[in-house]
Amino acid sequence: MQSSAVFSLSPSLPLLKPRRLSLRHHPITTAASSSDLNVSPNVVSIPSLSRRSWRLASSDSPLRAWSGVPSPISHSLDTNRFRTAATAVPESAEEGDNSGKLTKVLELGLLFAMWYLFNIYFNIYNKQVLKALHAPMTVTLVQFAVGSVLITIMWVLNLYKRPKISGAQLAAILPLAVVHTLGNLFTNMSLGKVSVSFTHTIKAMEPFFSVLLSAMFLGEKPTPWVLGAIVPIVGGVALASISEVSFNWAGFSSAMASNLTNQSRNVLSKKVMVKKDDSLDNITLFSIITLMSLVLMAPVTFFTEGIKFTPSYIQSAGVNVKQIYTKSLIAALCFHAYQQVSYMILARVSPVTHSVGNCVKRVVVIVSSVIFFKTPVSPVNAFGTGIALAGVFLYSRVKGIKPKPKTA
């Protein structure tokens, strides 16, 4: 359209009367591109003026008569305008979805960082307390006691919903509480005898016991992929054990017993089939098990080790009372916190992802303990540990693979 074009009435049309234009509530809308307007060289469509087509007279074109037929070009402009407005909403929604996904990823990353950090602090402070007191039962009892206090506070302040548990549910949970108590006790016994890195290397054997117990009591036949992943785990632990500087049979056997009891808990949870409802999620179940473990552990500790957590006994052992109390409290808080966070992560990711994260956690704990305690590690020991952890990672990836059904 030429810039010299103007609206005019030709003198050769005396009977043509100009029409009065009605511009009520009709703003002229311009599009972002010429393709939306469909502009021809001498025609501009203005949809707001009663959908009529106006001809513009330029210096080289005569004035033509008005047309009363609605312009299809104008209708196309309206359609394009409404289509553009409609597509703006999904774009906003997509931006909101992306923002929500980013928030969830950051939240999950923070939970994983907390999970690893609590594990590092627990193992370091727990090892220091066990090395000073030589009382694994007392230390285990303190950890259950601190956890029970935290659970009680959560329920009293209504920070977490207090469950309504029936007698039948308590009876079903009791075996889980027994093996949970034994598992933590055996872990502390091992940490008191050998290095943190060696204890966690032995605990990498958990998949072996899981496969063994599941086959014995649940009738679950392992796939060739799972059996293939078990081989480097067993071989790596054996290689690390024969080259471990702090090796002793008490520490090795305790760690193995911890593997057996912890995996027995998993098998029992499937065998017993605890009925879960809205009031009995994983965190609530863990809380109930912790309270029951305290009740189970208290009499056994008093009859075997006596009361060894008093200031007088600690002083007689030549240990700083304040340091022992502080480190014991931090270790117990971290012990309870990392298990709570672990269940929070499990509620957000798949079991396979959680297993991979648990494998990485073990690597982080081993490396951090070696650095902190300056544990001597031979090349053979490091190689064996690496092979075992690689096997655990492989197991976590292949255990969900189901064999293809045989076709007739």
From Swiss-Prot:
Record localization: Plastid, Chloroplast membrane
Matches recorded under InterPro entries: Sugar_P_trans_dom (IPR004853), Tpt_PEP_transl (IPR004696), TPT_transporter (IPR050186)
Tagged with keyword Plastid: yes
Tissue expression: Expressed in root columella, lateral root cap and root vasculature tissue. In leaves, highly expressed in xylem parenchyma cells. In flowers, expressed in sepals, petals, filaments of the stamens, anthers and stigma.
GO CC field: chloroplast; chloroplast envelope; chloroplast membrane; plastid; plastid inner membrane
Disulfide bonds: none
Segment annotated as transit peptide: 1-85
Effect of residue 251 to E: In cue1-7; strong reticulate leaf phenotype
Domain EamA: 124-241
PANTHER family reported in the protein's UniProt record: SOLUTE CARRIER FAMILY 35
Summary of the function given for this chain in its UniProt record: Phosphoenolpyruvate/phosphate translocator that transports phosphoenolpyruvate (PEP), 2-phosphoglycerate, 3-phosphoglycerate and dihydroxyacetone phosphate. Imports PEP to the chloroplast stroma as one substrate of the shikimate pathway, from which aromatic amino acids and a variety of secondary products derive. Required for correct leaf mesophyll cell development and expression of chlorophyll a/b binding protein 3 (CAB3).
Family: Belongs to the TPT transporter family. PPT (TC 2.A.7.9) subfamily.
Protein name listed in UniProt: Phosphoenolpyruvate/phosphate translocator 1, chloroplastic
Organism: Arabidopsis thaliana
Lineage: Eukaryota, Viridiplantae, Streptophyta, Embryophyta, Tracheophyta
